[in-house]
Amino acid sequence: MIDIVPPRAQHVPQLHQLYLDAVAAAPHCRFAPDEARFGDELLGRAAPVPLLSAPRDQRVFVAEEGGAARGFAALAWYTDWDGGEHQAITALFFADEAAGRALIDACEGAAGPGRLLAFPDTHGKSPVAEYNCGWNGLSDRVPHVARALVRAGYSPYQRELHMALDLRAFPPQALPVPAGVELSEEPDDRGRVWIRAIVGGRKVADCIFSTLSQLSPDADAARTGYIWGLGVVEGFRRRGLARVLMARALERLVGQGCDACWLTTTADNWPAQPLYLSLGFVVVDCSASFRKG
């Protein structure tokens, strides 16, 4: 019989190994937490990662059978960047179908009225901050979780491409700044850098980047850059601004010792994909976000 219980310290070794096994093939899950860090995250003792915007509230459930931990899930409530209020299953990892179903039932039983998301299309809501570099979509490399969600009535509503660039094979090329455009660079309080394109005193484009050193003490995390956002306002697109900003961001990352850069982009973001591919990025994984109701 499977019982749903709060996480306890004795669950941590089993759940940590279960998590590592589940995400082992997911490229953007490469920088996984060690057992001590994972335990602090599951038990709510971990210091927040400034790079990520944590949920407002969260509950973690463990599926236990015969004293053994068979999986865990998290239910979170958060306000998204657009002001929308959401509730979502932000983690779901399990050893067998029965444990997965019990965990989904526990999350649904604790959720409020309205639509429930699973692995939502946002950053920073998983209790395991390192999961997918903070992106909460469910990696295609974890198909048994997708299968459990769909069998429980969830449907995918967004797909994301996970991309990676080898900066040694494709070093960035400096590009001239278009006439009439000024570039500014400024760090924010989350450890990221914003490069902005200014025209006539107005911001018309920006690119946000950092290394992944905040997410992991692994030396390779400090050598891996991440693009958190790239945008150009309507009316200034197709003028090469995005390419100029990306080239500048990649130059800065190389200057910080990076030899790789990662990003995610919505699968139907057709205008941006030629830019990323031309710079040398390749698709290494995909992820999906789900909803029910």
Protein language model regions, located:
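Residue-level recognition of the GNAT/N-acetyltransferase active site
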Residues: 90-95, 228, 233, 237, ...
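C-terminal "cap" of GNAT-fold acetyltransferases
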Residues: 142-145, 152-155, 161-177, 259, ...
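Conserved donor-binding loop and adjoining core beta-sheet/short helix segment
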Residues: 22-23, 27, 31-111, 120-124, ...
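Conserved active-site alpha-helix within GNAT-family acetyltransferase domains
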Residues: 124-156, 243, 267-285
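Conserved acetyl-CoA-binding loop-helix of GNAT-fold acetyltransferases
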Residues: 96-111, 232, 238-255, 273-278
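A short beta-loop-alpha structural element at the N-terminal edge
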Residues: 3-17, 23-28, 183-191
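Conserved GNAT acetyl-CoA-binding A-motif
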Residues: 111-137, 253-264
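Flexible, substrate/cofactor-facing loop regions flanked by secondary structure
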Residues: 156-238
